[in-house]
Amino acid sequence: MIMSVPLFHGSIVALLTPMTHGEVNYQEIKNLVEYHIQAGSHGIVAMGTTGESTTLSIDEHVKVIKKTVEFADGRIPIIAGSGSNATSEAVTITKLLNGVGVVGCLSVVPYYNKPTQEGLYLHYKAIAESTELPQILYNVPSRTGCDLKPETIGRLSEIPNIIGVKEATGDLTRLPLIKTLAGEDFIFLSGDDATGLESMKLGGQGVISVTNNLAAADMAKMCELVLAGNFAEAEAINQRLIDLHHDLFIEANPIPVKWAAYKLGLISEPSLRLPLTPLSETAQPTILKALQKAGLI
């Protein structure tokens, strides 16, 4: 391992990308970075799924990451979303991030083209060999249509700068298996807010969180409590947030979280780029109810 675990722990926000009339609003990114620093978030992922990376150009993608690093100014670790379903493009993006100031990269399993496990191994090997930046694998089969198997994760863990995985399967049985195959030092970050607390109780180091966009202080406190072994207090916070954990996926992420952030005044409009469309009117009462239960409104 080439990085220490504390850089990748606790409540790491999967940061949304504010837009005004469909264009990236960098001032609002700056505002969000300040919000997360003040709230005690343990890290920021820029340009992940929640950040709408798939609807931005490569130039926009890299600029958002660079500006996020600039705004953070060393006060909070920034992890860059850098994946693609084309290995060559993922390598290109990763190389562009060398020297930018991110602490590592989060690289999603190639989507749509459904590679074999050997193809996935070679994909990640090529990316890792193109950089010295620490790499975190990102497994989210519900979106990609392809599952990175624990056995393949174990193989990939032998590559020095592949240091961890974001598991968004919600399947807690995978955690001990991955730890067995990849080693106890291999970082396990939950990509599923609903099971994030339980994954940390089982030995995971944290959660890359959508809910954190709205409830940053609560998520940070919950993670700190569970990692310190204070499970009852952590569970009390988690129960207030549990409806958000689920309902922020009532429509495709980041549609609900952008609308919720707008309602909370964190961004000026819930603008998205097609093919993503605004939250439907029928879904809005569900999100409002979850925000109320969380004590956010």
UniProtKB/Swiss-Prot annotation:
Cross-referenced Pfam families, in alphabetical order? DHDPS
Alphabetical UniProt keywords: Amino-acid biosynthesis, Cytoplasm, Diaminopimelate biosynthesis, Lyase, Lysine biosynthesis, Schiff base
UniProt cross-references to SMART domains, sorted A to Z: DHDPS (SM01130)
Q: Which residues form the active site?
A: Y138 (proton donor/acceptor), K166 (schiff-base intermediate with substrate)
Could you say which residues bind pyruvate here? T50, I208
Listed under catalytic activity are: L-aspartate 4-semialdehyde + pyruvate = (2S,4S)-4-hydroxy-2,3,4,5-tetrahydrodipicolinate + H2O + H(+)
Of the GO CC terms on this record, one is: cytosol
Q: Where in the cell is it found?
A: Cytoplasm
What pathway does this protein act in?
Amino-acid biosynthesis; L-lysine biosynthesis via DAP pathway; (S)-tetrahydrodipicolinate from L-aspartate: step 3/4
**Marked site (Part of a proton relay during catalysis) residue numbers:** T49, Y112
MF terms in GO: 4-hydroxy-tetrahydrodipicolinate synthase activity
Q: Which domain of life is it from?
A: Bacteria
Its Gene Ontology biological processes? diaminopimelate biosynthetic process; lysine biosynthetic process via diaminopimelate
Enzyme nomenclature, EC number: 4.3.3.7
Q: Which SUPFAM superfamilies match?
A: Aldolase (SSF51569)
Which protein family is named in the record? Belongs to the DapA family.
What does the annotation say about its assembly with partners?
Homotetramer; dimer of dimers.
Task of the protein:
Catalyzes the condensation of (S)-aspartate-beta-semialdehyde [(S)-ASA] and pyruvate to 4-hydroxy-tetrahydrodipicolinate (HTPA).
Instruction: Kindly give the PANTHER family that the UniProt entry links to this protein.
Output: 4-HYDROXY-2-OXOGLUTARATE ALDOLASE, MITOCHONDRIAL, DIHYDRODIPICOLINATE SYNTHASE
Q: What is this protein called?
A: 4-hydroxy-tetrahydrodipicolinate synthase
Organism annotation: Haemophilus ducreyi (strain 35000HP / ATCC 700724)
